[in-house]
A protein has these predicted regions:
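Divalent metal-coordination and catalytic microenvironments
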Residues: 7, 20, 25, 54, ...
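Active-site gating loops and adjacent loop-to-helix segments of metal-dependent hydrolytic enzymes
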Residues: 71-72, 76-80, 84-100, 148-169, ...
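Histidine-rich, glycine-flanked metal-binding segment
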Residues: 1-2, 9-58, 382
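Divalent metal-dependent hydrolysis catalytic cores, especially in the metallo-beta-lactamase
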Residues: 84-137, 152-166, 188-202, 222-227
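His/Asp/Glu-enriched, well-ordered alpha-helical/loop segment
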Residues: 274-359
Length: 390
């Protein structure tokens, strides 16, 4: 068991200074700091105590868009990004990842993706994934996305299917609807999220295909989950309307250059809240391990950076520096993705919830990281490393 004392808890709601008891991967007890649980002597002897001395304690971050196998490959095999190692996430306060395939869903496929998800789980990280990739028809493990979702526990939805992008397979509205229908029905059958996670490129068509799919079908708007919606300012304005219509939209925490026609995740989140759009229908992800690419007018790769899970905590710091409270800023990184993905025991600090916790230092960095009750980072030092980390 693990007793955490004197934690300034944001659940995401601010609860004040509390003590917590963790055991069996769960939060067993949560009480005021002045209260100490009267444990039997045998349990006291086996319990570890961490005194946070008033440090802020938040739910572990849920990163809903991660290239766990590595992304890239748009300029030859040498540009394929290596797989992401465990501490790349834990040191950044990320306790849950959702893996996916991007442009390269040929050299990399669902078998490798699923194996990487299982490997991360064995190393202590919470991990799930989407089936499919950028292209239509999608790559699958069982022969169809529908049966992938029904029979493979780790698959939560379909994605990331590319639209409004020169790298996409230029799917039609009917093709998009068939995928959305498969995701929706599989979600009904299994209780999974059953969402269609859609990569948005820089194309001027923007969210037109999603709007048409919603208007022309009976499929609920919540099934359609577009990401990268802050990459163009006009696209972001479209995303506000889509959120009002019932979709959850996802911001990407990527770097934005001065004068670029884009919003940082912090800027976009501030604008989103100011717009009055539903606060529960916005999430932020990192695109960790993905290729943050720039292309020339001929569609050739001009430059690339690699997405980092550290962008999530950096965005949280920027939001607070801009005057937003931690209580308001946290849900898009915690409870909102948990709700979208139907991970009912995650994204919150409450009795019975999974013990996925991050203590922040004064600078907003991850001081202590706990996943299902196991300490991975303590005093900013990695204490649990991945299999091939030194």
């Amino acid at each position: 068991m693990l007793l955490i004392r004197n934690a300034d808890v944001f659940a995401p709601r601010a609860l004040g200074v509390r003590n917590l008891l963790l055991g069996g991967g769960k939060i067993l007890w949560l009480g005021p700091a002045r209260e100490l649980l009267d444990l039997p002597a045998a349990l006291r002897a086996d319990s570890q105590i961490i005194d946070l001395d008033g440090a802020r304690l938040i739910p572990g971050l849920i990163d809903g868009h991660v290239h766990v196998t590595g992304g890239g490959g748009e300029a030859g095999f040498a540009t394929r990004i290596p797989p992401q190692l465990l501490s790349r996430f834990t040191t950044c306060g990320v306790t849950t990842v959702i893996g996916l395939l991007g442009t390269d869903d040929v050299a990399r496929g669902p078998r490798e993706l699923l194996a990487t998800v299982y490997a991360l789980r064995e190393q202590g990280l919470n991990a799930w994934s989407y089936t499919g990739g950028y292209h239509v028809p999608p790559v699958t493990l069982t022969g169809s996305v529908h049966s992938d979702l029904v029979f493979i526990e780790a698959f939560l939805g379909i994605g990331e299917v590319a639209i409004s992008d020169h790298r996409s397979s230029q799917p039609t509205c009917d093709e998009l609807l068939r995928l959305a229908g498969a995701a929706h029905v599989a979600g009904l059958m299994t209780g999974k999220a059953g969402v269609l996670h859609l990569h948005l490129g820089d194309g001027q068509r923007g969210l037109e295909l999603i709007r048409r799919a919603i208007a022309d079908s009976e499929i609920p708007a919540r099934v359609f989950n577009p990401t990268h919606v802050n990459r163009r300012r006009a696209l972001f304005e479209e995303a506000l309307e889509l959120a009002r219509a019932g979709s959850t939209v996802d911001l990407t925490a990527f770097p934005v250059k001065r004068g670029e026609d884009a919003y940082t995740a912090a800027e976009a989140l501030q604008r989103y809240f100011a717009s009055g759009a539903p606060a529960e229908r916005i999430t932020v992800s990192s695109d960790a391990g993905g290729c943050l690419a720039c292309f020339d007018s001929d569609g050739h790769l001009a430059s690339m950076e690699v997405g980092s899970a550290g962008a999530l905590l950096q965005t949280l710091r920027e939001l607070q520096a801009g005057g937003m409270s931690l209580e308001q800023a946290l849900p898009p990184f915690t409870s909102n993705p948990a709700r979208l993905l139907r991970l009912s025991d995650k994204g919150m600090i409450a009795v019975g919830a999974d013990a996925d916790l991050v203590a922040l230092d004064a600078d907003g960095a991850a001081q202590t990281v706990i996943i299902r009750g196991e300490v991975h980072v303590r005093d900013r030092t990695v204490v649990r490393r991945g299999t091939f980390e030194t």
